[in-house]
């Protein structure tokens, strides 16, 4: 199994949009300044869900993986807990709990899509507050925040989102300049015309659908392509909507509710 031990990207969960968290986070950073500590403050608070070693032509697979994790985890909810400020190497970080299942699932989906994800060393979820030139004593600092976490889109807006970020990317207004981002609150929510994909499609349609899409969108093997499209169609996931938006033939068959071959 390949690991991203020399990563060039990471899956990012940005935090700057959570006002309750940010109020406490900025207060902690101001304490460092008041103490006269020479440090570099983190300008884009986030949690790195996993690291990747990928090429630009794999971005689409990463986007599909992120959409799949959001779609499949329709009931994914709980709390994200930030606490225990401490030094991790030369960085002051917060412990983070609540992303464990998300981490495991996104790594599994990315690997299934041919992406090198996660490292051979144990993943330690954390949120960086500041970086020092050398290790510092930080005893006495306190921090605690619990943020409700919802990764579901049932017509409700949510602040949750995932991004693909290239390591070393610049930061603007509290966010990384990402290669792509998927925000739950911006998702399309229309449903397939029937729960039975096979009722209106035949295997012979796959080539016509594939011809409307970009190379690599659908597997070249017809059975694999059929299985993938059927899976996402019946679950109203992002990939169904991607094909619906980009394939004239697919939209026609959906509208006619009958095979046009």
Swiss-Prot record:
The record ties this protein, via InterPro entries, to: Coronavirus_NS2A, NS2A-like
Top-level taxon in the UniProt lineage? Viruses
User: Where is this chain's protein located in or outside the cell?
Assistant: Host cytoplasm
Keywords per UniProt: Host cytoplasm
Main localization (coarse):
host cell
Q: Per the record, what is one GO cellular component?
A: host cell cytoplasm
The answer to whether keyword S-adenosyl-L-methionine applies is: no
* Family classification: Belongs to the coronaviruses ns2a protein family.
Question: According to its UniProt entry, what is the function of this protein?
Answer: Not essential for virus replication in transformed murine cells.
Name of this chain's protein: Non-structural protein 2a
- Organism, per UniProt? Murine coronavirus (strain A59)
């Amino acid at each position: 199994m390949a690991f991203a031990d020399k990563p060039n990207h990471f899956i990012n969960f940005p935090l700057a949009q959570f006002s309750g968290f940010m109020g406490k986070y900025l207060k902690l950073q101001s304490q460092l300044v008041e103490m006269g500590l020479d440090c570099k403050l983190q300008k884009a608070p986030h949690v790195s869900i996993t690291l990747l070693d990928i090429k630009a032509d794999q971005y689409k697979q990463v986007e599909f993986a992120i959409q799949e994790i959001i779609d499949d985890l329709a009931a994914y909810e709980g709390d994200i807990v930030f606490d225990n400020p401490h030094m991790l190497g030369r960085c002051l970080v917060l412990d983070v709990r609540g992303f464990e299942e998300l981490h495991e699932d996104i790594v599994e989906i990315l690997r299934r899509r041919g992406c090198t994800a996660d490292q051979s060393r144990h993943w330690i979820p954390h949120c960086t507050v500041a970086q020092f030139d050398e290790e510092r004593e930080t005893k006495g600092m306190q921090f605690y925040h619990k943020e409700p976490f919802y990764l579901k889109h049932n017509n409700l807006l949510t602040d949750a989102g995932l991004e693909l970020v290239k390591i070393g990317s610049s930061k603007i207004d509290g966010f990384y300049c990402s290669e792509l981002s998927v925000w739950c609150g911006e998702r399309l929510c229309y449903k397939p015309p029937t729960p039975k994909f096979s009722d209106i499609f035949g295997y012979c349609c796959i080539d016509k659908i594939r011809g409307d899409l970009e190379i690599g969108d659908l597997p070249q093997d017809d059975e694999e392509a059929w299985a993938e499209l059927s899976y996402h169609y019946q679950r109203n996931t992002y990939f169904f909507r991607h094909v619906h938006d980009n394939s004239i033939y697919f939209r026609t068959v959906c509208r006619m509710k009958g095979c046009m071959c």
